[in-house]
């Protein structure tokens, strides 16, 4: 087991510990994991388990220095020297869950994000850090195209033979354990044949768009979502219709 795999195993364990009492999982945050790695590396270098680094800084100092917005922060740390990383992961989680103070942090309803970091010394000591944070929603929403509805071929004065098509889409904000911003709107783009993508709707709350597709041509539509915190999702896979 690699250190990265061990960290992801602990991520799953922590969210399983929450699920066991009916709590939603926390979202892993790469920025918090980077700080957790720094914390674990500092403890490994000092050979000491401590919430205060040798330079006097705490997790709050590091989070603030990295420009991470937060309303509340919790930290759990652990040490063991089990040779197998799988055993080290299991034992540190067990240690946290048999401590009322650590369990209260892991199962708190206040937090919505967390990060994990493992530091290993040359002699095999394992230093673990888990950082829990309550902060603004920074998880982008999702959007996807649905199957289009197509009509029969008709004759239009402007296009000649064409087919009426209605594209529709769905989306929502990804839920957090706390402070989910909520879906705000969609951006929609169209591409005719192999041309450039062009916006046809921006910040719209509608969920469908209709157009006529001329025979011999193709129109593709794609969508992305925005949430109320300003997060913008990725473009969906396009759905195209040829007439």
Cite the ranges covered by each PLM segment.
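Extracellular fibronectin type III
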Residues: 229-243
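Short, well-ordered surface patches within globular domains
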Residues: 2-66, 103, 109-114, 121-123
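Solvent-exposed loop/turn segments flanking beta-strands in beta-repeat/beta-sandwich domains
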Residues: 172-192
């Amino acid at each position: 087991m690699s250190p990265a795999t061990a960290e992801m195993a602990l991520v799953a364990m922590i969210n399983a510990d929450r699920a066991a009492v009916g709590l939603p999982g926390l979202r892993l945050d790469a920025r918090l994991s980077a700080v957790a790695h720094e914390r674990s590396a500092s403890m490994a270098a000092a050979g000491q388990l401590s919430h205060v680094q040798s330079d006097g800084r705490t997790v709050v100092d590091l989070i603030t220095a990295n420009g991470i917005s937060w309303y509340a922060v919790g930290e759990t740390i652990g040490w063991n020297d089990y040779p197998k990383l799988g055993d080290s992961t299991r034992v540190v989680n067990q240690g946290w869950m048999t401590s009322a103070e650590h369990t209260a942090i892991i199962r708190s309803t206040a937090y919505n994000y967390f990060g994990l970091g493992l530091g290993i010394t040359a002699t095999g000591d394992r230093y673990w850090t888990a950082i829990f944070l309550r902060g603004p929603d920074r998880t982008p929403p999702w959007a996807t195209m649905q199957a289009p509805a197509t009509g029969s071929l008709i004759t239009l004065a402007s296009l000649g033979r064409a087919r009426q098509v209605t594209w529709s889409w769905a989306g929502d904000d990804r839920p957090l354990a706390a402070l989910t911003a909520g879906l705000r709107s969609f951006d929609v783009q169209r591409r005719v044949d192999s041309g450039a993508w062009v916006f046809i709707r921006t910040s719209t709350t509608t969920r469908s768009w209709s157009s006529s597709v001329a025979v011999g041509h193709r129109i593709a539509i794609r969508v992305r979502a925005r949430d109320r915190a300003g997060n913008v999702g990725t473009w969906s896979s396009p759905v195209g219709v040829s007439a």
